[in-house]
Amino acid sequence: MDSDSCAAAFHPEEYSPTCKRRRTVEDFNKFCTFVLAYAGYIPYPKEELPLRSSPSPANSTAGTIDSDGWDTGFSDITPSVPDRCFSHLQPSLLQRAKPSNYLLDRKTTDKLKKKKRRKRRDSDIPVKEGFRESLLKLEAADPYVETPSSPTMQDIPQASADPCSGWDSDTPSSGSCATVSPDQVTEIKTEGKRTIVRQGKQVVFRDEDSTGNDEDIMVDSDDDSWDLVTCFCMKPFAGRPMIECNECHTWIHLSCAKIRKSNVPEVFVCQKCRDSKFDIRRSNRSRMGSRKLFLD
């Protein structure tokens, strides 16, 4: 490349098509925009400025030669060729050239969906908490306790007004139930889970068991067996439930025998009879062993 021919590029009237120049960053950017527009990634620029009028960077080595040399490289291609060849493809390319807008719309829709999900979760959380609190309250409440606010229990008279309520139908004295005034009903004491209530000449024992199967026991205090002592605990009958041993026919309190009133066995053997059987077997073994030694 001659210096004279390159120097002529500074004067447009002395421009020669044989002069070549170096490509600049601006030329590369223009080429990239053309390729992207051709591929459909970006739309075509609305106004294409003439390449010769674009100023070159101040720090470029070739100066204005760069702008003239870009036209020389594409001098054989007329500017109307892309418009003729690809004019029918421009609408489709413009439709394909909207991935960035589509992504933005998709992001906005995703954000809206996330917000809706958060609102639903926030609305579901207090409902779940209220349901759990109601369950905890129901579990904590005793199912056997009668609440005064319930409409069904308001019509039913309380147990203190009816002295016959809660008595066992199998007891002989339950048939002849006399009316007792509230003044005669006095609570004597409470022993553990048992409540002793005196109603005139009758005493009612009420056991508060967790199972709720135990019933009240009514015993006449004038009975001869009231002060009878038969159990091994050396305490009187006193109206407490008892069971008879099938071996020694001794009456023992259910509490001493560790038997629940809801689970009374048909055959019962007291602890003394069991121990005596064990002692008899052990003594027989010792006797047989001593006899064998004596015979030997």
Swiss-Prot record:
It is found in: Nucleus; Nucleus, Nucleoplasm. InterPro entries: PHD_PHF13, Znf_FYVE_PHD, Znf_PHD, Znf_RING/FYVE/PHD. Subject to proteasomal degradation. Stable when bound to chromatin. The soluble form is rapidly degraded. Disruption phenotype: Knockout mice are indistinguishable from wild-type littermates on the basis of appearance and breeding capacity. They have smaller testes and a reduced number of germ cells. Postpubertal homozygous mutant animals display a pronounced progressive loss of germ cells from an initially normal germ epithelium of the testis tubules leading to testis hypoplasia and early infertility. A zinc finger (PHD-type) spans 230-276. GO terms for biological process: cell division; chromosome segregation; DNA damage response; mitotic cell cycle; mitotic chromosome condensation. GO terms for molecular function: chromatin binding; chromatin-protein adaptor activity; histone H3K9me2/3 reader activity; zinc ion binding. Residues 53-64, 147-157, 168-183 have a biased composition (Polar residues). Residues 237-244 are annotated as: Interaction with trimethylated histone H3 (H3K4). Interacts with histone H3 that is trimethylated at 'Lys-4' (H3K4me3). Interacts with GSK3B. Interacts with TRIM28. Interacts with SETDB1; the interaction probably enhances SETDB1 chromatin-associated levels and activity. Modulates chromatin structure and DNA damage response by regulating key determinants of chromatin compaction and DNA damage response. Binds H3K4me3-containing chromatin and promotes DNA condensation by recruiting corepressors such as TRIM28 and H3K9 methyltransferase SETDB1. Required for normal chromosome condensation during the early stages of mitosis. Required for normal chromosome separation during mitosis. Increases both chromatin-associated levels and activity of H3K9 methyltransferases, such as SETDB1, thus enhancing H3K9 trimethylation. This is PHD finger protein 13. It comes from Mus musculus (Mouse). The lineage of its organism: Eukaryota, Metazoa, Chordata, Craniata, Vertebrata.
